Structure formats: C-alpha cells, structure tokens
C-alpha cells in the first residue's frame, strides 16, 4: 500500500467481547505535525435525545492510553446524544511511535502535541457539530488546557479529569528530578527510559499497578491490551519527562490561566498518586470560569473508576452539557450492542 492509500484507508478500532467499539464510529488516519500518521475516530449517536446531535465531545486520553480504553465513556456520551471525536496522541495507541522501540513512552516537544491537536480540530471541524466540549484526562487534560490558553476559541466548555499540571515525583524532590532530566538530555539520553525502568505493561497487576479501585474495569482493559499488544506503551523516557515538566510549568502561569474564557471543570481524584491535587485546585481558582470537584476515594483514572465515582464525573459532564447545549429531556438512552471486534493491524513504523 502506498503512502497516499495508507492515509485514505479507515483506521482500525480494536475490541474484545464485552469491550468492543460503540456502534456508529469510524476510525481514520490524519496527518499530524511533520506529516506523522495519527489515528482518530468519530462517532455519531444512533439514538438522539433531541432532534439532532447536541454537539461534539472531543476526547483526549492520558499518557499510554489509546482510544480503545475510552469505549465505555464514549458510549456514555453517545447515549446522551453527543457526537464523539477521540484520538491517539503521537507515540501511543495506533498513532506513529517516535522511537523504534514501540514500548518507550517518548515525547520531543510540547509544540508538536499542540500542533497535532490543532490539526485534529481542523480536519474534523466540518463534520463535528457544535457546540464542542473538551474532555481530557491527565496528560490530555494538560494539553487541552494549554490549547485554551493558546487562544483556541472553538470550544464552549471543558471537563478535565485529574489533569497532569504537576506530576508527583515520589521520594525525589522536584529540583533533583529537573537536574536529572537536564543531565540526561545534555548527554544524549532523551530516548532512554527514566532510571532504566521499562515498566512493561504486560507485567502489571491490579494489586500493584492499578490506577483505579474497580478491578473489573481494570481487567477488561487488560484483556483489550493482550488482544492487541500494539496498543501497549511502557515506561516514560527522559524526553517524555522533560516534556511533562515543561507542559505543566507553562500551563500554570497565572496570566495564561486568566485568558481562558470558557467554563472549565477540573474533576480530581482525591487519592491521586500521579498528580498533585492541590495544584489542580489552585489552577481551577485562577481560571476565569473554573470549577474544582474532588471525588473522595477515587484514584487517578476517574473515568475507569467504580460506578459511584464515575457518576460524579458524568454529573459534571451533564452539567456542562446542559449549559452549552440545553435540551428538555436529558435522560440517557441505551446504546445498542457493539459490533464484533475487528482484526489486529500490523504495527506502525516509528517516525
């Protein structure tokens, strides 16, 4: 298949029994910054709560996460009458990887990710009905916030799940981590694993590694990962860590936060061991129309949490939806059974 045909072909959406792609969706390739092949998927609701779709929810996953991990919440949005556009960031999912070793979670520069996101919006603007609601988790939430700070005006509201505005560094001080990052980048080790820790995702267990308290959702995602190992991403590189620190610092500038004019809800896990909840609360207070909601007992991956905790996130989404696209009847409707999973693709080549 030549390069033009590869972009024209539909991108696969993977699945396993019980966790297949919601109906009404099509996976597609698009070109990111530098011509990189990236994957996105667009869904139209099969049942409406109004005479037409209420708008579009644009979903941005966190580090390591592909579109497939968000099937359940995509189904929730569809049941509420929204179109959904979800995407794989560069370096993860079925988007092009940045290093020959596909398991390395790598990044080069914040600007590449922001450019990719702008190209995503441009590519689907004609098809994605407005108003648009931005939904981003962790790394995705930070990049979403930076997009708004950069002047993006096509969104009517945003709901961010535990955004990665300031990462936790364990027993190491932030100062020592930044020093280690600078040293490794200076010595050409940007593509090496942080502390040589590959963090093989296939060795993870619920007891040791889960970022949710819901074991059934965790195991369902594990089944998806084993069915399509090309989706897997391991530990971060020094380059990714430099990117994460840079994105967090830039997103937290008070002047930048004040420029965001749309309503933004930050929904934060109380038991988060990946990001500082205090920082996210601080940021919410400095947004022009920010709201901070903390979920007691929740771990980092709120959208994968137990039903009662997920319900808090969905309530915040519904409140945002009612504000930007009010309808008389907001009762969710059932999503029809999903189709059978598609076959596994060949892995994409590294850029």
Q: What does each model-found stretch correspond to?
A:
Residues 67, 74-100:
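Conserved alpha/beta-hydrolase
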Residues 262, 276-285:
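Short alpha-helix in the alpha/beta-hydrolase fold that links the catalytic acid
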Residues 291, 296-351:
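Catalytic active-site module of serine/aspartate enzymes centered on a nucleophile-bearing elbow/loop
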Residues 1-32, 36-46, 350-351:
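An N-terminal hydrophobic leader/cap segment in hydrolases
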Residues 260, 266-268:
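Short beta-strand/loop motif that positions the catalytic acidic residue
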Residues 144-230:
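Alpha/beta-hydrolase-fold enzymes
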Residues 271-275:
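Acidic catalytic loop of the alpha/beta-hydrolase fold
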């Amino acid at each position: 298949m030549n390069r033009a045909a590869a972009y024209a072909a539909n991108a696969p959406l993977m699945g396993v029994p019980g966790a297949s792609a919601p109906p009404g969706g099509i996976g597609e390739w698009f070109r990111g910054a530098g011509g990189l092949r990236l994957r996105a998927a667009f869904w139209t609701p099969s049942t409406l709560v109004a005479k037409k779709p209420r708008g579009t929810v644009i979903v941005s996953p966190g580090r390591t996460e592909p579109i497939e991990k968000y099937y359940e919440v995509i189904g929730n949005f569809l049941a509420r009458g929204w179109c959904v556009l979800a995407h794989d960031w560069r370096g993860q999912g079925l988007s092009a990887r940045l290093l020959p070793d596909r398991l390395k979670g790598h990044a080069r520069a914040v600007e590449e990710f922001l450019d990719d996101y702008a190209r995503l919006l441009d590519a689907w603007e004609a098809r994605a009905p407005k108003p648009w609601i931005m939904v981003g988790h962790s790394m995705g939430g930070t990049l979403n916030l930076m997009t708004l700070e950069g002047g993006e005006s096509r969104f009517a509201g945003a709901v961010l799940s535990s955004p990665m505005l300031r990462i936790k560094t364990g027993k190491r001080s932030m100062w020592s981590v930044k020093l280690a990052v600078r040293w490794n980048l200076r010595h050409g080790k940007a593509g090496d694993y942080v502390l040589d820790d590959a963090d093989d995702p296939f060795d993870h267990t619920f007891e040791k590694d889960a970022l949710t308290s819901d074991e059934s959702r965790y195991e369902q995602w594990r089944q998806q990962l084993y069915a399509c190992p090309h989706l897997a991403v391991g530990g971060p590189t020094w380059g990714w860590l430099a990117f994460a620190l840079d994105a967090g610092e830039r997103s937290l500038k008070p002047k930048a936060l004040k420029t965001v004019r749309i309503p933004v809800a930050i929904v934060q896990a109380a038991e988060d061991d990946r990001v500082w909840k205090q920082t996210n609360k601080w940021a919410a207070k400095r947004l022009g129309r920010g709201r901070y909601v903390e979920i007691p007992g929740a771990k980092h991956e709120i959208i994968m949490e137990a039903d009662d905790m997920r319900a808090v996130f969905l309530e915040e989404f519904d409140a945002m939806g009612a504000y930007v696209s009010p309808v008389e009847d907001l009762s969710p409707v059932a999503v029809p059974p999903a189709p059978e999973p598609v076959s596994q693709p060949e892995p994409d080549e590294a850029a």
